[in-house]
């Protein structure tokens, strides 16, 4: 058995008699270790882990370091063939094998549906909360003997998104029954098309109890560890005249770029950009912030244009950089240099990335997802961190960024707020 913390051992003991479990452990509490050990205890000959693309190598290395059975990267066709050779072998002669594949690729491998008598482990199971997504539909078609779900934010506080996960755990409650028992909602008439609005939740104690009965373990960091203090700094950035003009007219020219907000989505997009890479005040403030510290710094960003501006500042200051986004995952400078700047795109790096060698995060621009925002905080504030953690939010005054952060702090996706509450863009931001 792995050398586990007491609370991790307790989670395994609490679910020792179950073959369908969910470990909803707060970010940084070692879900990887708990999940892999549960998989080992279940003892299925064939095992499949589905995770984010950026986590495949981490999972492969974890199994190779701590266990004796083969672990294959199924995003590689050659290793996929080796995996199936091992499947044939262990089914005949015994033993164990595990394959690891990312969500985006799994549903493009229909042969995985032929697996039987296997353990299915979903890392960041919150990624199957959209029941109409191809990844979710594919996973729900699978026939695992055992299920292990891992997530720090299973639904980001939105219980209606639990359906697919609780069905995998064996709680076969009908969707309409779930909504009627646990969700307060109503329909708005949207020009003849009914729009479902969630008002809140009810009977949540009963819901949590039922989830416990079906193998769910919930655990927060502050229940088991005393982590260092978190200190937040909101750095006010002057908005530009271009932003103000765009708010009034919905059109503006910045350099060679003409921005036209001809609908709600494009207007929101360009307002965000005008608060980011188009705002020289923010770029200048970011430069000053980097100059004020020689420690490692993590910078979260949204758009490629922001990445270029951040890289330019780092180049000017002669700061080594590592980049984590959908195109690359290079942490060499982060690992080798004490003054490295790690530039992280939210979707690619806010989940499952351990950056605790740093104790400083800069939010160049905010995400729209409260889940990504919550996960990003834990990249440095996690088990093993010994230093006080500092967070810097670069917020353009009287702008969309203030509204976004207000929503995120309340646990609301900003896109949901726009569509469900019909935000008037002409309202003051104060």
Mark where each language-model region is:
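Conserved pre-motif I regulatory segment
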Residues: 1-24
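Conserved P-loop NTPase motor "coupling/switch" region that bridges the ATPase
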Residues: 45-46, 81, 119, 127, ...
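Walker A/P-loop
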Residues: 18-38
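Conserved Walker A/P-loop ATP-binding site and its immediately adjacent core
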Residues: 34, 44-65, 157-161, 303-304
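A conserved SF2-helicase RecA2
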Residues: 368-430
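Conserved helicase/translocase motor-coupling segment
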Residues: 222-316
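Conserved helix-turn-beta segment of the N-terminal RecA-like "Helicase ATP-binding" lobe
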Residues: 55-79, 169-173
């Amino acid at each position: 058995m792995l050398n586990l913390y007491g609370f991790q051992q307790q989670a395994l003991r609490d679910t020792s008699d179950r073959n369908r479990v969910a470990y909803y452990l707060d970010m940084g509490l070692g879900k990887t270790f708990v999940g892999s050990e549960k998989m080992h205890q279940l003892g299925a000959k064939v095992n499949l882990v589905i995770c984010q693309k950026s986590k495949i190598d981490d999972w492969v290395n974890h199994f190779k370091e701590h266990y004796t059975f083969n672990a294959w990267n199924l995003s590689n066709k050659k290793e996929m063939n080796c995996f199936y050779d091992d499947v044939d072998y262990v089914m005949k002669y015994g033993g164990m094998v595990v394959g690891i594949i990312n969500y985006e690729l799994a549903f493009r491998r229909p042969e995985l549906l032929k697996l039987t008598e296997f353990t299915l482990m979903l890392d960041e199971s919150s990624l199957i909360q959209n029941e109409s997504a191809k990844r979710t539909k594919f996973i729900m078609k699978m026939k695992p003997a055992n299920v292990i779900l891992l997530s720090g934010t299973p639904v980001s506080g939105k219980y209606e998104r639990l359906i697919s996960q609780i069905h995998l755990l064996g709680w076969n409650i009908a969707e309409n029954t779930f909504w009627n028992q646990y969700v307060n909602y109503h329909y708005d008439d949207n020009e003849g098309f009914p729009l479902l609005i969630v008002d809140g939740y009810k009977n949540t104690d009963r819901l949590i109890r039922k989830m416990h009965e079906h193998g769910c373990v919930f655990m927060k960091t502050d229940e088991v560890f005393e982590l260092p203090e978190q200190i937040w700094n909101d750095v006010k950035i002057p908005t530009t005249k271009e932003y103000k003009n765009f708010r009034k007219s919905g059109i503006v020219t910045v350099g060679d770029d003409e921005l036209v907000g001809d609908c709600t989505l494009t207007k929101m997009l360009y307002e965000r950009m005008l608060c980011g890479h188009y705002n020289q005040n923010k770029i200048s403030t970011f430069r000053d912030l980097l100059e004020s510290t020689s420690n490692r710094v993590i910078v979260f960003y949204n758009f490629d244009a922001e990445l270029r501006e951040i890289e330019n500042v780092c180049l000017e200051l002669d700061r080594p950089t590592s980049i984590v986004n959908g195109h690359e995952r290079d942490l060499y400078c982060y690992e080798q240099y004490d003054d490295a700047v790690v530039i992280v795109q939210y979707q690619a790096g806010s989940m499952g990335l351990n950056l605790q060698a740093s104790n400083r995060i800069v939010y160049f621009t905010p995400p729209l997802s409260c889940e990504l925002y919550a996960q990003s905080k834990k990249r440095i504030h996690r088990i093993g961190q010994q230093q006080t953690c500092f967070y810097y939010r670069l917020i353009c005054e009287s702008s969309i960024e203030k509204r976004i952060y207000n929503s995120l702090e309340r646990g609301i996706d900003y896109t949901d707020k726009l569509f469900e509450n019909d935000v008037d863009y002409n309202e003051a931001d104060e």
